[in-house]
From Swiss-Prot:
The lineage of its organism: Eukaryota, Metazoa, Chordata, Craniata, Vertebrata. It comes from the Eukaryota. Residues 29-106 form the Ig-like C2-type domain. Glycans are attached at residues 125, 135, 223. The gene is IL12B. Its main location: secreted. Belongs to the IL-12B family. Residues 1-22 form the signal peptide. This is Interleukin-12 subunit beta. GO terms for molecular function: cytokine activity; cytokine receptor activity; interleukin-12 alpha subunit binding; interleukin-12 receptor binding. Heterodimer with IL12A; disulfide-linked. The heterodimer is known as interleukin IL-12. Heterodimer with IL23A; disulfide-linked. The heterodimer is known as interleukin IL-23. Also secreted as a monomer. Interacts with NBR1; this interaction promotes IL-12 secretion. Residues 238-329 form the Fibronectin type-III domain. One of its GO terms (cellular component) is membrane. The keyword Signal applies.
Length: 329
């Protein structure tokens, strides 16, 4: 949130907020007005200033009304509800001089609204953003869910502490083809790829990465934040190249696998541990899992069963990979 008066030079559009400083610039010509949301709330007074050195012949209109709202270089409006938000335009002699788009950020009982994204409910605290990294390269993926289909826009920014010179760059949020069902309702999934510019995979992390998602739906603005260390969001790809070797005169087989290609190297330093599980024919019959650091194991595998292997960082209890499997047949 802005902590000083927002004053642009005479050739640009200027918005001045009330002393509560409840207005700030999201992007060029787009401003967020922060409102306490309760019955009979007074709202916020906003002053719009046109981008012309002239003082006469200026009129104001809004997208909500074609009527002239006022005249002169400035227009003062009281913003109390969504009907007061949207586009405001100043004109002179039929010429458009500048635009301003006002969005509202609601606060009810001291809590900012979180209506746009779906709470993924994976902890005691609300979880709107989830992030994963396949290795320690500094590259990670974040995603979120929403039931909204239209008039929706996201922007993402990230950093690793204000005092850390290493920047984090995020691409544009994209709509995934995957649809996620939660409580019998289908949600759309958005993802974003981020990369820490000067990541050092072997270095100890002292500052968390912070990610902020700005979400806009129609005239509503919300933001969502998450903070984490890369080590906490590590989830390797599944082991690759699973192979079975029958053992002579035995019902046992030797199953072997390799580290996933995307895992950090050298493997002698970035080591994985593995979990092995044998499934029966109906896939519901499962024997106890075996845990080991080697890339092979001897197990009993019956016809029509399968062997599953997954991986996790050996030295830090982050997430297990998805399973890789091979048929016993």
């Amino acid at each position: 949130m802005c902590h000083q008066w927002l004053v642009l030079s005479w050739f640009s559009l200027v918005l001045l907020a009330s002393p509560l400083m409840a207005i700030w610039e999201l992007e060029k010509d787009v401003y967020v007005v922060e409102l306490d949301w309760y019955p009979d709330a007074p709202g916020e007074m906003v002053v719009l200033t046109c981008n012309t050195p002239e003082e006469e012949g200026i009129t104001w209109t809004s997208a909500q009304s074609n009527e002239v709202l006022g005249s002169g270089k400035t227009l003062t409006i009281q913003v109390k509800e969504f009907g007061d938000a949207g586009w405001y335009t100043c004109h002179k002699g039929g010429e458009v001089l500048s635009h301003s788009h006002l969005l509202l950020h609601k606060k009810e009982d001291g809590i900012w609204s979180t209506d746009i994204l779906k709470d993924q409910k994976e902890s005691k605290n609300k979880t709107f953003l989830k992030c994963e990294a396949k290795n320690y390269s500094g590259r990670f993926t974040c995603w979120w869910l929403t039931a909204i289909s239209t008039d929706l826009k996201f922007s993402v920014k990230s950093s690793r502490g204000s005092s850390d010179p290493r920047g984090v760059t995020c691409g544009a949020a994209t709509l995934s083809a995957e649809r996620v069902s939660v409580d019998d309702r289908e949600y759309k999934k958005y993802t974003v790829e981020c990369q820490e510019g000067s990541a050092c995979p072997a270095a100890e992390e002292s500052l968390p990465i912070e990610i902020v998602v700005d979400a806009v739906h129609k005239l509503k603005y919300e933001n969502y934040t998450s903070g984490f260390f890369i080590r906490d969001i590590i989830k390797p790809d599944p082991p690759k190249n699973l192979q079975l070797k029958p053992l002579k005169n035995s019902r046992q087989v030797e199953v072997s696998w390799e580290y996933p290609e995307t895992w950090s190297t050298p493997h002698s330093y970035f080591s994985l541990t593995f979990s092995i599980q044998v499934q029966g024919k109906n896939k519901k019959e499962r024997k106890d899992r075996l845990f080991m650091d080697e890339t092979s194991a001897t197990v009993t595998c019956h016809k029509d069963g399968q062997i599953r292997v997954q991986a996790r960082d050996r030295y830090y209890s982050s997430s297990w990979s998805e399973w890789a499997s091979v048929s016993c047949s």
